[in-house]
């Protein structure tokens, strides 16, 4: 009850402080697409695996664009992996803090190295088809506390939060 009263009578400075804190958190979340101009070719969730024909969980979203398109970090963070990762092929993983990580897989080439701090929209690689892949795309994953979430929901949230309307 007293917290409600404190909130109601909080000073403009406290409200501004809360607002700035929220802006800092939003700025660290992956609320953008890793490609400028993209088409979804395979959604997040259960699907028929295009290689073996069996029902399987697809823990990311596959996005395609023009050949040679840059793959961009969707939020600031630190590159924790950049290299070959089995069925993912050439892959980059970024830790954004707060338990949030993103993965960018099947890249044709990688232009960052582990330990590098990256800003949002920093190029991390070039779209490709390495590893277990059936065509040129980026397989994009969002993990929160090691749980996979639908990346499209993050992209759409960013479009909503940062829209000018």
Whereabouts are the PLM-identified features?
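Non-catalytic extracellular/periplasmic "stalk"
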Residues: 1-39, 43
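Catalytic cores of peptidoglycan-degrading enzymes
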Residues: 27-165
